[in-house]
Amino acid sequence: EYRRQRQMCIRDREKLAKGTSGFTGADLENLLNEAALLAGRRDEKAITMADLQQSVIKVIAGPEKHSRVIPEHERRLTAYHEAGHAVVMHTLPDLDPVHQITIVPRGQAGGMTIFLPDEDRSYLSRTHLLNSIAGLLGGRAAEQLVLGDISTGASNDISRATQLARKMVGTYGMSDRMGSVAFDAGHDEVFIGRSMAQTRPYSEETAAEMD
């Protein structure tokens, strides 16, 4: 329907398909609407790949916050932070390639590094998960290395890395020390701070070891 409304000049359909992996029908509808608006503002009859790529980012992360004035030192910090993510993710194996880096604020984020998968992953290897954790912490590492200080900008990265590490140990059984056991199956309170009075099928010593 939307392709009938506007001619779409998409030379790299495979790249677009990778960038919209996991999108729902509503997401795709929103994507094409946003791309059509961008083309319309230029009085163009065709939607370009650039329009679609910008629309993908907007659907994922929200609109740009042009009204927000960012101090120069914060823009610099954000640039190094996002570059840190990109360098680590580009260097380590078994990770999705870097697609775009931006320091334009969107939603709650001051910037972001966007990755596009080469393929759909049904299973995640231990190498992929460990390297993903390293990539999440790459922004904090870049701040420390280049600026000599760290900021609260990595708080979401640290939270995601911690959750991923805990899943590797408690859900996926990927810890050499703990073995191939799913400790948190139905008992995730040890990881998310619920009451310790709830029944757990393992000892306090095991819980401490997992932490």
Spans of features found by a protein language model:
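AAA+ ATPase "lid" subdomain C-terminal helix
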Residues: T20-A50, I57-K65, A86-V98, M168-S175
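Soluble catalytic regions of large protease machineries
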Residues: R76-A79, A86-D211
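A short secondary-structure junction motif
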Residues: Q7, V59-P63, R140, Q144
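Structural motif detector for alpha-helix initiation sites
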Residues: R13, G25, T48-M49, R126, ...
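Short conserved motifs of the RecA-like P-loop NTPase core
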Residues: R11-G22, E34, H66-H73
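Short, conserved phosphate-binding/catalytic loop or strand-edge motifs used
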Residues: Q53-K58, G107-A109
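Single conserved hydrophobic/aromatic residue that forms the stacking wall/gate
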Residues: E1-I10
